[in-house]
A protein has these predicted regions:
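Glycine-centered, small-residue-biased loops immediately flanking beta-strands
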Residues: 255-258
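Local beta-strand N-terminus motif with an aromatic residue
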Residues: 76, 163, 208, 229-232
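C-terminal substrate-binding/catalytic core of Rossmann-like NAD(P)-dependent dehydrogenases/reductases
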Residues: 224, 228, 265-302
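Glycine-rich beta-strand-centered segment in the early N-terminal region that forms part
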Residues: 7-23, 38-91, 133-135
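Mid-domain Rossmann-like dinucleotide-binding core that forms the NAD(H)/NADP(H) cofactor-binding site
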Residues: 128, 133-217, 221-222
């Protein structure tokens, strides 16, 4: 880490300046700091930042200054910043999917432009500021990353009150938060799979319909029996070769199933292609969430 001193930015136009109260450390920050993601077979996917860029995208702070075109936010109030900011000009941005903006043109805080590991953060528009309600200062910023990631992944499963048909793999911070959101926002109690008994016990306490230890040799049979023939959707918050191997066995003979891949542990995985067609199955990557989904999530938080 290197300390860098800059003049405090002065917002103009639609820009706003936020004084950082707290900024979380995301696991992807570690990958970015390390300079790569694991592509399997010894391959590394580069993730190095430009020199002297300030990291940090889970930002919560106090609004201290605004540009002359800003009118809908309040100086002195605390806000969570939506960090997945696009160029505003490409098709993805114009369709409300700024988080899908090209990495060559995106303006993601802490990834493409200076982020929250600093005293102040300059944000290009007031629309990226969100009231966090009564959320604790040290947790509020995480709603814009892990909270949004979990919420968006859950929406992609298209599950509707089928608690024993949705499996969450990984009972870490993301998985546990997804479990809470599934219960509160979707009225679903997913089953949860992990290799850590302590995490599984916590998941059960928080309302999982059932928990399963992935180290058990008969875990697939256990899940199949509980779910009456296999699940309809899996959200994988680990993203390893081992979890994909396990997760794709959990569907049984069910058709139209969805595998939502979120975790970035890394690796490489091979598929039996005809089974994808015969089973009408979908494997879908899920990357953070849209600005509209952030509005939905923060409405739930408040």
């Amino acid at each position: 880490l290197v300390e860098i001193n800059h003049e405090t930015p002065i917002p103009v136009g639609k820009q706003v300046l936020v004084k950082t109260i707290a900024c979380g450390v995301c696991h992807s920050d570690i990958h970015i700091h390390d300079g790569f993601f694991d592509g399997g077979d010894g391959n590394k996917i580069p993730s190095r930042l430009q020199d002297n860029l300030t990291m940090g995208h889970e930002v919560y702070g106090e609004l201290v200054s605004v540009g002359e075109e800003v009118s809908n936010v309040e100086i002195g109030k605390k806000y969570v910043i939506y960090p997945w900011i696009g160029c505003g000009e490409c098709d993805q941005c114009k369709n409300g999917m700024e988080h899908y903006c090209s990495p060559f043109t995106a303006q993601n805080l802490g990834v493409n432009v200076d982020g929250g590991y600093s005293d102040y953060v300059l944000v290009k528009d007031e629309k990226y500021l969100f009231d966090a309600g009564d959320a604790p200062d040290n947790l509020a910023g995480s709603y814009a990353c892990r909270g949004l990631t979990a919420y968006s992944a859950l929406k992609k499963t298209n599950q509707n009150n089928t608690s024993n048909k949705l499996a969450i793999i990984g009972a870490g911070g993301l998985g546990v938060l997804a479990l809470k959101i599934a219960k509160s926002a979707f009225n679903i109690q997913p089953l949860v799979i992990d290799i850590d008994e302590q995490k599984l016990n916590l998941a059960k306490e928080l309302g999982a319909s059932a928990v399963f230890n992935a180290t058990h040799t008969n875990v697939v049979e256990e899940v199949s029996e509980f779910s009456n023939g296999g699940v309809h959707a899996v959200i994988d918050f680990v993203g390893s070769e081992q979890t994909l191997e396990l997760g794709n066995k959990l569907f049984g003979l069910n058709k139209g199933c969805k595998y939502i891949l979120v975790g970035l542990f890394g690796g490489k995985y091979s598929l039996t292609l005809p089974m994808m067609t015969f089973g009408a199955r979908t494997i879908e990557g899920s990357y953070v969430g849209s600005l509209a989904e952030m509005h939905e999530l923060m409405g739930l938080v408040r």
